[in-house]
Amino acid sequence: MAREMVRGGGRSARIQKAVHEVTRKLLDRLERSAITVPMIAEQAGVTPSTIYRRWGDIGQLFADVAVERLRPVAEPEDTGSTRGDLEAYLLPYAEEMSSPVGQQLIRDVLTDAQTGVAAGKCCQYTYDAFDVIAARARARGEEPLPSEELVDRLVAPINYHILFADREVGPAYCRQLLDRLPPVARAKAVAA
């Protein structure tokens, strides 16, 4: 009787982990232009064809590594108010993304423009964070703005100014954006 082979992605996950780890280490040490697929493959213990098959090219690999670095490790901070939650999310976001490392991560994500997969994942991280904040607001009896509107009013202007480097996106600017939001409507209490 033949044994059933169970493939839960173990080997695939190990390969991805090894390639990502080597790529991150090389990016920390070397200029991007000095990093090659064969270099990554050798240090990760895989063949270059494995990397090309999975990621297509080095730009897509950099984008995949950037997405992994940008993945949130926790839900947005719960401050007890929608404004506080948005501020606690937005200020560190702007600081991180406007740093040299953050700017490079943005460039890496945008390198994958052919498929848009990397950018889509990063965008979803933001929507997920705003959805958590909105759920908390509703639990407090508030009617929050839709996540799409928060992206348009908060995240989009920050990213625009980061990409075009035409102004600082520090705490004062982030608070100005927050001040421009319409007030969160309190849900009417239903008499029991």
Explain the meaning of each model-derived region.
Residues 29-32, 52-62:
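HTH DNA-binding helix-turn interface
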Residues 59-66, 97-117:
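Amphipathic alpha-helical segments used for helix-helix packing
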Residues 95-100, 114-140, 148:
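Amphipathic alpha-helical packing segments from all-alpha helical-bundle domains
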Residues 37, 66-73:
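Short, basic, alpha-helical segments at the C-terminal edge of helix-turn-helix-like DNA-binding modules
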Residues 2-3, 95, 128-139, 164-192:
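C-terminal peripheral helix-coil segments that are non-catalytic and often amphipathic
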Residues 74-103, 151:
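Hydrophobic alpha-helical connector segments
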Residues 54-56, 159-160, 182:
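Tryptophan-centric aromatic hotspots in well-structured domains and transmembrane helices
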Residues 1-43, 49:
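Basic, helix-initiating cap at the start of DNA-binding domains
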